[in-house]
Amino acid sequence: MKVINISNTMSIMSIILLILPLLYNLLSLKKINFPLYCKNMIMLAFMMSLPSLLLFMYKGQESIITNWHWFSIHSFNISMSFKMDFFSIIFIPIALFVTWAILEFSLWYMHSDPNISQFFKYLIIFLLTMIILVSANNLFQLFIGWEGVGIMSFLLIGWWYGRSDANTAALQAILYNRIGDIGFMLTMAWLMLNCNSWDLQHIFSMNMHPIALLGLIIAATGKSAQFSLHPWLPSAMEGPTPVSALLHSSTMVVAGIFLLIRFHPMLENNKTMLTITLCLGALTTLFTAMCAIMQNDIKKIVAFSTSSQLGLMMVTVGLNQPHLAFLHICTHAFFKAMLFLCSGSIIHNLNDEQDIRKMGGLFYTLPITSSALMTGSLALMGTPFLAGFYSKDSIIEAMNTSYTNSWALTITLIATSLTAIYSLRIIYYTLLGHPRFMTMSPLNENNPNLINPIIRLALGTIFAGFMLTTNMPPSYSITMTMPMFIKQMALMVTTTGLMMGMELNSLTNKLMKSNNHTNNFLTMLGFYTQIMHRMQPLISLFMGQRIATMLIDMNWYEKAGPKGQANVHSKLSSLISSSQKGLMKMYFLSFLVSMIFIILFT
């Protein structure tokens, strides 16, 4: 009990330290360097969260912190409670460590921004809402964190609001996430009606309807940018590079996967939902890996690699291995944040140049950035004994030894091979060869705010996977025996991708005509955005115009409305007037005939 109290106290203290910078203007009258103060608070919060992690590693005890009762609706009660279990205790220190590096990098990258203090506040709120989402013990609190990361992503992606592309990307992100939120709210409504509780313990004790589970999958599809709701993720690169690093490493994009991991006790018994999750993730990881190969923007390549890894996490959830998916979230956070920080360093040093075709030879001028970029790319490939190896290798082993869909297995292995191709492409174009940029670019790595966070994340990339896998008890079934070729499958696939990447990169030095159809398909992202963003509005506007002209104008106005009434009256008046010819003899004759008939009948 004493161990649990110490762990809970440290966890609450780390959250309080995150709130202090947000209240700084209300509590302090002294003028200090606010961005530096925020960075120091994040560092202290990380240090404060380490005892909870160490105690959990030593004792393995989980707890639920219930602070106060919020409100009641008849017999429906909602309390403020935090669930400190395996997932939240491990994830919070990793998120704090990565955010600490990103905030320190932002001191260098955003130093000339006039609103840098507001920028740091937004980043801290972004992190805080993600921690609320991870540690929530009920759906209402989880929904607050869920919506919080969505709102903060909108504000941070559109940070440079003077650029129309940034505003469009921010709107695109929030609109795609609204679709996912519909699924989440559908599940919440079903649980309120059928379970009469939003507490996770009560939810896990009942059987959920497939419609409610499908709502969770839709929510994860929108938030984690799975296929069909994926275009917002590469567009989010219009925001500042620190935003991209935080967004892709440990906050918003992994929130959808974390939601499925949290609700996995409900998913594991429904094979249909697991199959949907498996196939959706496999399709996402292949499509985005193919798109990454044809991109020339360094941030877009890293963004598509994130989407591909999210698809791999979704595949792992579909394999009924949630702890492996969580392990990949943790290892992925280190090298993905480092890749974005290295990209930001290169972009900043090359006067905001993002095209990898205009780079080259940076290994000699930016050695620390280049070494970290190469380390992160190798970890992304799944190179042995780096962070990505411990999770990707286990995922592919679990997939090869499970009774799963061979179609999903095949395209996931192809996507893993493509990962090596686009990772090698970044290394080849940016670090090797001759410089292809202007010679007057002020290249330097003299600022410690640039070097220190990259070095810390590089150390995490090298050692985090080993530390996580050796100190945490395995919470999933391990395949003890397997054929040698299955054990070596991940390494063979990665090696094949490396060889293909080297061959493709060597072809760029030769004058060869490319296949325009394949090139256009992948460069235009499968024409998905053109179809969904242009065809649907075109169809809506066309149908609206046709309905307005055919139904309202032609039918109502011309047949039943004023014009129709005018036509009826004009025909009636013409009929009456046509009977009046103006012939006096005819009138007298009709009068005479009428008089004769009257006399005869009377």
From Swiss-Prot:
Q: Which reaction does it catalyse?
A: a ubiquinone + NADH + 5 H(+)(in) = a ubiquinol + NAD(+) + 4 H(+)(out)
Mind telling me which residue stretches traverse the membrane in this protein? 9-29, 36-56, 86-106, 116-136, 142-162, 173-193, 202-222, 241-261, 273-293, 301-320, 324-344, 361-381, 407-427, 450-470, 482-502, 582-602
What organism does the record attribute this protein to? Didelphis virginiana (North American opossum)
Q: Which GO terms describe its biological process?
A: ATP synthesis coupled electron transport; electron transport coupled proton transport
This entry's Gene Ontology molecular function terms read: NADH dehydrogenase (ubiquinone) activity
Question: What's the protein here called?
Answer: NADH-ubiquinone oxidoreductase chain 5
Show the GO cellular component annotation of the record. Answer: mitochondrial inner membrane
- Role this protein plays: Core subunit of the mitochondrial membrane respiratory chain NADH dehydrogenase (Complex I) that is believed to belong to the minimal assembly required for catalysis. Complex I functions in the transfer of electrons from NADH to the respiratory chain. The immediate electron acceptor for the enzyme is believed to be ubiquinone.
Q: Which family does it belong to?
A: Belongs to the complex I subunit 5 family.
The record's EC number reads 7.1.1.2
Pfam families per the record? Answer: NADH5_C, Proton_antipo_M, Proton_antipo_N
Q: Where in the cell is it found?
A: Mitochondrion inner membrane
Return the InterPro entries for the record.
NADH_DH_su5_C, NADHpl_OxRdtase_5_subgr, ND/Mrp_TM, NU5C-like, Proton_antipo_N
Domain of life from the UniProt record: Eukaryota
Cite the entry's keywords alphabetically. Electron transport, Membrane, Mitochondrion, Mitochondrion inner membrane, NAD, Respiratory chain, Translocase, Transmembrane, Transmembrane helix, Transport, Ubiquinone
Topology in the membrane?
Multi-pass membrane protein
First-tier enzyme category under EC: translocase
